[in-house]
Amino acid sequence: MNASRCDLLRRQFDLTWSLFEYHLERLDTEDFLWRPTPLCWTVHLRADGRWMPDWSETEPDPVPVPTIGWLSWHIDWWWSTTIELHLGRRPRDREDIAWPGDAEGAIGRLRELREEWLGVLDDLDDAALDAASPSPWGQGPDHTVAHTAAWVNAELMKNVAEIGQLRMVRAASSG
């Protein structure tokens, strides 16, 4: 049996998402806002009623530990940007992407992004994978849709592992 590149990318994505669902089903709002250490990046309720993330244009040293809330905002930012660019639309500025404010909203948003991305994946064939892919991160003209899809899988897998680890550490430390 010879699986296509599209099938491999989709199966890898589905595996990553199934691991994510394991954690999403167990999260509550307190988990999203739990600070595992004093040096954290999290989300904050601003006076205008929007939840916005900590951010620095240059990576701090040491790097702050992100909260689940910050990570879920981060996923929304990079994934929505990737989807919008792939669909030929102008993505929102990072500063325009707010965290939803609670577990239900954050989990709902992540599941919306999954559905949008599945629409992208399901429209791909091997020829489409070889097309140039626009990217806000400047990978250059040799960057293909296949590279982008593989990167989404890897970045999501990393973020899922981070969220899962934070959730398990919080659960173990409170019990």
Give the ranges of each region predicted by the language model.
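Short, contiguous alpha-helical
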Residues: A3-D96, P134-G175
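Acidic/histidine-rich alpha-helical segments that form the ligand environment
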Residues: A98-D130, H147-M157
